[in-house]
């Protein structure tokens, strides 16, 4: 499937890059985002846009909330999933990456769904200190607080690599949960054991969010040897548009991580589109190394593609994470005003 020959897929291109961070880490020692921010999740709630995102401080991830009136200028509200006391499975940190939505239509603003009077967030946690250190598991948190600042986590993970197949024995990463035909579908990427490892994307099903059954066809989106996604097929962002399901994922070939697109009619059989949908930038640009970890929505007819941009650290950057500057930025289908 070639983007240049397929007018349908052209509608998901966002060639106009903002070129500056919409959110960057604080760089303040001791702050949850001292070294980097990552993994945007944008939705509309109580009359304004909200973004959950994760910050890294050298020890682990914590999740924070920001709000905006225009999708470009964001006000930080504070940490909503923080580090726990030692002993808990998620004591190192909690990377909140998805809150269950009313629907998954790309052409309507994403709004949160209440289930039994609660909003539900999916997060993952790594067992060791450091950057994504050790095999992560997936948990759930809930809130009845309309400010979305106060969350309660379930005591145990709801999904683990421990009972998974070989392709996921190295641990789990980002998940997203969509509802279809009164069933929950959780898409997630996982890695193989050892180094170097592969990351691929699979799915699991549930009736209650607590008990999950893996798809026997996993991984549904494997790596493609020799291609731009030959090592990682990661961080699914699944939405519905027209009569198709879309998965905005990122691929990695050992040098650059870039966002791509896969298409499905039934959530089980996926066809990858050829080449990246959102490519990394030129050397020195904000996303000169990586343009990855998509969050995609449409507002006032414009498609917004939020992502994590990475390039080598430069003098004056707010943060330095292992010699890299990692921030959240956005690209759009129309020029920014």
Indicate where each model-derived feature is located.
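Membrane-spanning beta-strands of outer-membrane beta-barrel proteins
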Residues: 35, 92, 133-136, 170, ...
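Short glycine/serine/proline-enriched coil/turn segments at secondary-structure junctions
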Residues: 57-59, 88-90, 129-132, 166-168, ...
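Short conserved catalytic/interaction loops centered on acidic-Pro-aromatic/His motifs
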Residues: 258-259, 272
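Beta-propeller blade signature
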Residues: 64-71, 136-146, 200-209, 260-267, ...
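Acidic/polar residues in short coil/turn loops that connect beta-strands
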Residues: 33, 46, 57-58, 70, ...
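Short proline/glycine-enriched turn/loop segments at secondary-structure junctions
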Residues: 285, 316-321
């Amino acid at each position: 499937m070639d983007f240049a020959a397929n007018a349908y897929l052209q509608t998901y291109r966002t060639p106009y890059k903002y070129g500056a961070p919409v959110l960057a880490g604080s760089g303040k020692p001791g702050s949850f985002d001292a070294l980097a921010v990552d993994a945007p999740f944008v939705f509309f709630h109580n009359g304004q846009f909200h973004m959950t995102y994760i910050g890294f401080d050298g020890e682990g991830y914590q999740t924070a909330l920001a709000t905006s009136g225009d999708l470009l200028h964001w006000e930080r509200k504070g940490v909503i999933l923080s580090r726990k006391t030692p002993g808990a499975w998620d004591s190192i940190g909690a990377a909140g990456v998805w809150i269950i939505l009313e629907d998954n239509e790309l052409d309507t603003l994403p709004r949160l769904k209440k289930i039994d009077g609660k909003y539900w967030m999916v997060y993952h946690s790594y067992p060791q200190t450091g950057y994504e250190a050790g095999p992560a598991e997936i948990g759930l948190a809930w809130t009845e607080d309309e400010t979305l600042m106060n969350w309660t986590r379930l005591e145990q993970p709801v999904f683990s690599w421990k009972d998974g197949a070989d392709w996921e024995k190295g641990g789990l990463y980002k998940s997203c949960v969509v509802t279809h035909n009164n069933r929950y579908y959780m898409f997630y990427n996982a890695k193989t054991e050892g180094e170097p490892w592969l990351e691929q994307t699979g799915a699991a099903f549930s009736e209650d969010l607590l008990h999950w059954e893996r798809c026997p066809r996993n991984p549904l989106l494997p790596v493609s040897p020799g291609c731009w996604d030959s090592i990682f097929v990661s961080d699914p962002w699944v939405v519905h548009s027209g009569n198709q399901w879309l998965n905005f994922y990122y691929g990695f070939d050992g040098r650059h991580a870039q966002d791509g697109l896969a298409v499905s009619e039934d959530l089980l059989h996926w066809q990858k589109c050829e080449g990246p949908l959102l490519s990394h930038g030129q050397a020195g640009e904000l996303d000169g190394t990586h343009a990855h970890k998509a969050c995609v929505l449409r507002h006032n007819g414009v498609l917004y593609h939020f992502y994590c941009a990475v390039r080598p650290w430069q003098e004056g950057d707010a943060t330095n994470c292992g010699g890299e500057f990692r921030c959240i930025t956005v690209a759009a289908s129309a020029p920014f005003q």
